[in-house]
């Protein structure tokens, strides 16, 4: 007589789900068919069908590192399951994690993931990226990855803000700070509903990733120390990415709200609220010598930009030993901008370069087919009467840059729009940079 293996027998006879490796202390695996049990642990979600769900133990205190449990849970839930991080619980991550093996997995974050603030450890143990000397606690990769829930991903950034005060990230950064969430070689990754809090550096960085979507995510970086504000805590950044969708976002970070970096294409942004940011920026690109960078096919609509340094911005590097490329086919539509230093900006003298050096070594990034449509609000007056500052590089092609129905005011007087070295006009009256007082 043929006997089924015990795991198959139990599954067939009793519907019991058998873990792929032995359970670790505090863990649980609930079959998708156990509706009542899933409901009891908080694993059901109105938008997503039930799946086999894995839970792990929560941290007992701020020093109780559950990194190995978290990694185990992801491996158990991989290939069709779900990892649940329970509401009201905190899961402390104190070791770097390579999560680039994921395939068809859901992470339901209802509690809080919190990283330790051991600066010495993280600066010695991280994943390093040459681009702007970036590091991260962990990296996510694979395909068909969904992260959703009402929980918090907490970078525990206050100690990093305090230690970093007075230092500079570009170009001479030596004080590396981790990125809160990084994807690398990922395809079809979505994040929905969660809060991302107090990243030490950029909040999100997508690298070599296709089809990334964020919806209804709140990103916030704040300091409890008035002398050490968060720095370089961009909301969203990308490098070598095709296919981006950011919808219904609230971002309050003190740096770029959204800033696609080199070779990001096919971007859709809708219903984004940005407070205290450096704006929705295309770039910077053209930083590295001999490299061609592209940002192309971008549609941004229904965005509110409040109390920021910049509003709608395009930025490209100038100077010796920089690169080249293009920013092409970008639409900013239905944008409200209030109390912002520079509401509309084309900056081709980026980064930290004086006017003499920029004139000697101008940017080689072409800016083409840019539309600013239905833009209204006010500047802060910090740049005088200027509400739009579009100064193109004499060594670049700048054409088909259009302002349509732009109604921006300045508290310093009649609003001025600056434009230089743009071929064919911009659709409205503008003056040369040399004729204005800043």
Curated annotation (Swiss-Prot):
Listed disulfide bonds for this chain?
257-274, 392-398
Against InterPro entries, the record matches this protein to: Glyco_hydro_28 (IPR000743), Pectin_lyas_fold (IPR012334), Pectin_lyase_fold/virulence (IPR011050)
Q: Which residues are glycosylated?
A: 118, 185, 225, 263, 275, 302, 329, 354, 366, 400, 407
Where does this protein chiefly localize?
secreted
Name of one Pfam family that matches: Glyco_hydro_28
Q: What is its EC number?
A: 3.2.1.67
User: Which keywords are on file for this protein?
Assistant: Cell wall biogenesis/degradation, Disulfide bond, Glycoprotein, Glycosidase, Hydrolase, Repeat, Secreted, Signal
In which ranges do the PbH1 repeats occur?
209-248, 295-316, 327-348, 398-430
Keyword Secreted tagged: yes
Gene Ontology annotations of biological process type: cell wall organization; pectin catabolic process
Cellular localisation? Secreted
Q: What class of enzyme is it?
A: hydrolase
Q: Which segment of the chain is annotated as a signal peptide?
A: 1-15
Provide the active-site residues from the annotation. Answer: 255, 278
Keyword Hydrolase annotated: yes
Q: What does this protein do?
A: Specific in hydrolyzing the terminal glycosidic bond of polygalacturonic acid and oligogalacturonates.
Family note? Belongs to the glycosyl hydrolase 28 family.
Could you identify this protein by its name? Probable exopolygalacturonase B
**What organism is recorded for this protein?**
Aspergillus niger (strain ATCC MYA-4892 / CBS 513.88 / FGSC A1513)
Q: Which gene encodes it?
A: pgxB
